[in-house]
């Protein structure tokens, strides 16, 4: 396709071409039925939805002023073709991201006594962070803390003086979102003191969870059964 990424082998993969076709198709059908519609229907394409607050700018511009209900949908690879996934209450978790910079003292692998080994510090920190989900949050309330990147080191026999960790957290409630964030700060401070390292946590708040209204969800369910 012509609208592919300029970076070879990299794609967003959300299926926004499908979303565009779905919304335009809906607009075409409803425009043919406009005489039967009591009220106003707006069709919204949300820009910059992945972390750049496109919806926030749309709200500021007055796009949803006077809107009583809003419906959105997203393609999903786990959903069988020809079906619609419907759920009231929490359906998508709050998604935050974080970067942790660990600074120590490098040196030769044969003389570790004069160093602050960032690999050791990082390994303890990663293990400690996992206890937030397993020991601090309610097992009945789904939460996730995942570290997807560990970067650092120079060579097989050189003790690393800096390591960068990057990851994400997910929570269905604001309470758990804040709990994870606060515990991360506490654990970072404890590990920093334990190993005499310098650790900086850069935690970026993302979007709040998606919580579907029960009545509106029932409307979608009834319509889906008819279609």
Question: Where would I find each of the regions flagged by the language model?
Answer:
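Histidine/acidic-residue-rich, glycine-tolerant segments that coordinate divalent metal ions
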Residues: 2-11, 17-18, 23, 35-160
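A generic secondary-structure signal
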Residues: 29, 61, 190-191
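Ordered, soluble secondary-structure elements with a strong preference for glycine-centered loop motifs
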Residues: 12-13, 112, 174-179
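Amphipathic alpha-helical interaction elements
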Residues: 32-35, 172
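Metal-dependent amide/peptide-bond hydrolase catalytic core
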Residues: 120-227
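Histidine-anchored nucleotide/phosphate-binding helix
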Residues: 24-30
């Amino acid at each position: 396709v012509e609208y592919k990424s300029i970076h070879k082998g990299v794609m967003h993969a959300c299926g926004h071409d499908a979303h565009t076709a779905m919304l335009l198709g809906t607009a075409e059908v409803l425009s043919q039925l406009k005489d039967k519609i009591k009220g106003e229907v707006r069709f919204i394409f949300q820009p910059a939805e992945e972390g750049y607050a496109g919806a926030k700018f749309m709200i500021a511009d007055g796009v949803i002023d006077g809107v009583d209900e809003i419906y959105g949908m997203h393609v999903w690879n786990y959903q069988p073709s020809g079906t619609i996934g419907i759920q009231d209450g929490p359906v998508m978790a709050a998604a935050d991201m974080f970067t942790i910079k660990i600074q120590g003292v490098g040196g030769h692998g044969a003389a570790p006594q004069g160093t602050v080994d960032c690999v050791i510090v990082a390994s303890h920190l990663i293990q400690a962070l996992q206890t937030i989900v397993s020991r601090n949050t309610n097992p009945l309330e789904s939460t996730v803390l995942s570290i997807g990147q560990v970067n650092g080191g120079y060579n097989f026999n050189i003790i690393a003086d800096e390591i960068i960790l990057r990851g994400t957290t997910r929570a269905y409630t604001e309470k758990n979102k804040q709990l994870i964030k606060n515990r991360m700060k506490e654990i970072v401070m404890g590990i920093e003191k334990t190993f005499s390292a310098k650790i900086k946590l850069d935690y970026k708040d993302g979007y709040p969870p998606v919580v579907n209204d029960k009545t509106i969800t029932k409307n979608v369910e009834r319509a889906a059964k008819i279609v």
